[in-house]
């Protein structure tokens, strides 16, 4: 048994912040949470880890990022989506045919994720089976848990980055057969997006998802040019989402990145089927796609999480993704003359942490029975404030100001992976 002491801050529900000053998390030997206490229990036979006045918070969850785009952070930010893909993305991803290169990049990515406080991910790899397995291995070694997908892509790629339909099927099965060795990083089916996959491949993936009980991730309604392209490719689909639905890919736990231009009918279809939005504000602004209607999605009962969308987004640290999401919501607030309420810090943190943990079967906040996923934030080097700060004020400053060095300890799946 272990006991973690510090200022406990969590977001058990949207807009709600729960604070236990100088509290304690009591952990079972397997790293699951036994209880939340206001003080160390008397006669407790446990190792006490005292983090002093630091903040102990549930870790971050990145629900959408492209691992092979990590080398191209900050490149092509003046280009619209399709031009950016053709100019930079496909060429960069093609390099991951080289397993040695993949190992170098993915080892760094895994380290950067965990030391930034992200312990769970829903991640795209490239179409390369061997590189995808290397990615899963490096994430698991670093302590990052979650889902990783080998990309499927049998049309509209580039000469160096495209499979045939049969290659895509064969390599997907080879990848899935090799995934059994991983304990905390699991496979998720990943058709890149409708323009990249033929109807035959999409339908095959839908059947595979049903047969093996696999989740699905892809992209939806990111920008207007993409939506128009889908209409050309799928003239029998009245809306973008139907191209996934007819293939059996539109279902509970499907993660759709962006949803910037999803109209009322598309949002309704998402809610009815349990489809999850991964909101990627930084990427949507960088590539001039727009600003997703997050408040509307939440008000209508949709499931919303946050993603860095590396490398459309240029920020891996999820606290920066949270603050970018808050700023984006303020753009919509101003454009709507105040009718569209902006996200508060508590709400942004919930979306970037608790909502993601809930996707993976956990809960918002520190809940008995959950394996601990937490970060310890030492904010002692922040500029001295003019008055003593409450834990709530310190939490807000941490979300806006903390850097990797402020995260002095990380707990993932019950284990202390950074200390």
Language-model region placement:
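N-terminal metal-binding scaffold of metallo-dependent hydrolase/deaminase domains
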Residues: 1-43, 55
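C-terminal cap of metal-dependent C-N hydrolases
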Residues: 13, 371-419
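Divalent metal-coordination and catalytic microenvironments
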Residues: 25, 31, 53, 64, ...
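Active-site gating loops and adjacent loop-to-helix segments of metal-dependent hydrolytic enzymes
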Residues: 71-104, 150, 155-165, 223-251, ...
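Alpha-helical scaffold segments that flank or form the walls of functional sites
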Residues: 73-144, 168-181
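Metal-coordinating catalytic core of metallo-dependent amide/deamination hydrolases
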Residues: 130-259
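His/Asp/Glu-enriched, well-ordered alpha-helical/loop segment
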Residues: 246-253, 295-383
